[in-house]
Amino acid sequence: MKTPSQPRAIYYIVAIQIWEYFSFYGMRALLILYLTHQLGFDDNHAISLFSAYASLVYVTPILGGWLADRLLGNRTAVIAGALLMTLGHVVLGIDTNSTFSLYLALAIIICGYGLFKSNISCLLGELYDENDHRRDGGFSLLYAAGNIGSIAAPIACGLAAQWYGWHVGFALAGGGMFIGLLIFLSGHRHFQSTRSMDKKALTSVKFALPVWSWLVVMLCLAPVFFTLLLENDWSGYLLAIVCLIAAQIIARMMIKFPEHRRALWQIVLLMFVGTLFWVLAQQGGSTISLFIDRFVNRQAFNIEVPTALFQSVNAIAVMLAGVVLAWLASPESRGNSTLRVWLKFAFGLLLMACGFMLLAFDARHAAADGQASMGVMISGLALMGFAELFIDPVAIAQITRLKMSGVLTGIYMLATGAVANWLAGVVAQQTTESQISGMAIAAYQRFFSQMGEWTLACVAIIVVLAFATRFLFSTPTNMIQESND
């Protein structure tokens, strides 16, 4: 019997997903280098801005999802988000010497990312009935598409920026998003079954004006608001407010469902360890990128490899790790039992620690010989990428076993995305030249060593905890969703 093919609309979603990842990760690979090289920001300022931007892009999808659910529909939200991200890159590329253009461009991209990121997966979900067996394959295709974009982006945008200038690198990132949008719009006839804008809600009157007019005002003011946050380094205050709200939600869950309190505490612990992991992993876009730019010998075949290209190593490692992880989870490889959740977490952190130890070794080599080894750096980054698939997929798999998985997944993403990126900036400032004047290489060596040592200590704690409490993640059956939910 022939297996039904995927809906035609999925290929347009996959196309825009590839180009969105290309746009986002292309610009991200250039950002810290652009701030320090072109605009002359010191390390402290550059890392603070980079971490603020990286954290805020994980806050706005909450609002973007709400707007799509209440007013816009997923398809319209995706289109609006893609347009805003394209506009943001255009603003960034017009004047690469203006700090105001920088802040405004990042703010526009943050708003666009919020509308796009939270709704592209929801739009894909609309293509399937609840029990459609093609659903898992569709989401796997979407995930693979993202990896293609994130691998290609640092290579293409990095080479463009090095050969033709920053404005070309940013233009390429924005152009990719625009190409993805055009492909997506060309398939509009395949999205007839998806939810459209709620015209009745948009034309209803609230506070003396139609709702659509308030929406326009909000879309115009939001970039101004985020520009102020970035320019004045106020993002931490917004993040603190959002985290307090998230903590209150979990506390109310514990009060409302006392029988679930133990499982909720376990999820909170997962969030804590996941956040720790991503504080370390997000050093790749700031501290590690600056180290590569300044101290790694990037000559290969008489060509200087652009620093941005190293951002592709992580994505390549994630794809390769997916194959290995699938093998580990297969029935043939389980042995006596499936690897326990906390041992998987410990293994992921162990790989991260080994990666940082390799970086510390490379920094020591640079201190002695003047330059670090590109091969050692790539090996360290690959280990860090490999570690990723032992953290997030494991945590999400456990969270989604619970009845209140939607809210908890959102809070987990907030913790490991927004909070981790902001804290990563705080941690990274240990290496800033303004704090350790004239001893940059020593600062990097000490930083990488400390990160590796602290992570190894966390691994030891988690392993002891896992063996000391045999049923650490045994969950009451009434917490777990029924199989037919």
Swiss-Prot record:
Residues that span the membrane, as ranges = 13-33, 47-67, 71-93, 103-125, 141-161, 165-185, 209-229, 235-255, 263-283, 308-328, 341-361, 376-396, 407-427, 447-467
Per UniProt, what is one Pfam family of this protein?
Answer: PTR2
Q: Name one GO molecular function term.
A: tripeptide transmembrane transporter activity
* Listed GO CC annotations: plasma membrane
Q: Does the keyword Transmembrane apply?
A: yes
In this entry, the parts of the chain located on the Cytoplasmic side of the membrane are 1-12, 68-70, 126-140, 186-208, 256-262, 329-340, 397-406, 468-485
Q: What is the effect of changing residue 20 to Q?
A: Decrease in activity. Abolishes the pH dependency
Periplasmic topological intervals: 34-46, 94-102, 162-164, 230-234, 284-307, 362-375, 428-446
Give the pH dependence: Optimum pH is around 6.5.
The similarity comment for this entry is: Belongs to the major facilitator superfamily. Proton-dependent oligopeptide transporter (POT/PTR) (TC 2.A.17) family.
Q: What is this protein called?
A: Dipeptide and tripeptide permease C
Species of origin = Escherichia coli (strain K12)
